[in-house]
């Protein structure tokens, strides 16, 4: 059964569903802006932005994680779905970490071109929600920097392929502007568990995770500076803003990540 998505499903993306953005906090006069979640941002194409995505630690610093339904249509009965958003062409898709501000917003850490998208065929052929995750290979900027260097290499969580379901997790997402006119990030630290409706999925109960938060990272063991934690999955869906689910990373997710990391 396909999830009730909170980001850009193919149909939602076609209508320009907008994901909200990470707020930028200004320090005292003369100080540099502080980005509370520099690794997390939004996907962009054709001047629109939707869904949440985040930098995950990788050898080359070039990998971003999001939900599969944000970048690829769900298949059914072995037949791939139809792409409903022209911007999903690889040449146009990009990632803006720490995206912020009202309206069209700003991109304080730049806009990074997506080189390739890596999605499990369980999603593209069958719409299997337990495979609703994707990894994106990001091109370096004109100076040769990786996206991970731009957001801070010590800030990105490492992936965890063998996590259990019951973890203390921090989830960070960007609700659409209808529910978040100031475009401030929503975050929640709570206990994850099996979803009662689908025990193969992770579940949390936290308010404020409206449409636009699909792809939000679920980070276990997140601490202070130098303790970015472990990424165990990304937000997939949920019936309400209070109920959120995620597909737990597995060995197939690891294979996708490794493919993305090779560039």
What does each model-found stretch correspond to?
Residues 232, 238-263:
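C-terminal cap/linker of serine protease catalytic domains
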Residues 208-234:
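Catalytic nucleophile loop of clan PA
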Residues 42, 63-65, 94-96, 134-137, ...:
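Structural recognition of the beta-strand scaffold that forms the well-ordered cores
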Residues 129-205:
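Chymotrypsin/trypsin-fold serine protease catalytic domain
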Residues 48-50, 60-61, 70-73, 101-103, ...:
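Solvent-exposed loop/turn segments at secondary-structure junctions
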Residues 31, 35-100, 191-197, 206-207:
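Catalytic histidine site
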Residues 30-38, 49, 81-144:
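Conserved catalytic-core segment of clan PA serine endopeptidases
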Residues 1-28:
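Secretory targeting and sorting signals
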């Amino acid at each position: 059964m396909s999830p009730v998505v909170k980001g850009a499903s193919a149909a939602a993306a076609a209508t320009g569903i907008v994901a909200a953005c990470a707020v930028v906090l200004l320090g005292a006069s003369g100080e540099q802006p502080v980005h509370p979640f520099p690794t997390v941002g939004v996907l962009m194409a054709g001047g629109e932005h939707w869904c949440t995505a985040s930098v995950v630690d990788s050898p080359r610093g070039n990998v971003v994680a999001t939900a599969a339904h944000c970048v690829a249509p769900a298949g059914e009965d072995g037949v791939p779905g139809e792409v409903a958003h022209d911007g999903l062409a690889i040449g146009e898709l990009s990632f803006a970490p720490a995206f912020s501000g009202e309206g069209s917003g700003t991109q304080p850490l730049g806009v990074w071109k997506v080189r390739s998208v890596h999605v499990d065929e369980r999603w593209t052929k069958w719409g299997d929600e337990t495979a609703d995750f994707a990894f994106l290979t990001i091109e370096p900027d004109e100076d040769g920097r990786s996206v991970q260097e731009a957001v801070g290499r010590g800030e990105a969580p490492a992936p965890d392929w063998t996590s259990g379901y019951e973890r203390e997790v921090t989830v960070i997402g960007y609700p659409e502007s209808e529910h978040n006119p100031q475009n401030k990030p929503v975050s929640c630290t709570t206990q994850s568990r099996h979803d009662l409706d689908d025990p193969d999925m992770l579940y949390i109960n936290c308010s404020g995770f409206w449409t636009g938060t699909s792809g939000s990272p679920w980070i276990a063991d997140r601490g202070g500076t130098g303790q970015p934690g472990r990424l165990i999955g990304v937000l997939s869906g949920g019936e309400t803003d209070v109920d959120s689910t995620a597909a737990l990373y597995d060995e197939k997710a690891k294979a996708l990540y490794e493919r993305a990391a090779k560039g």
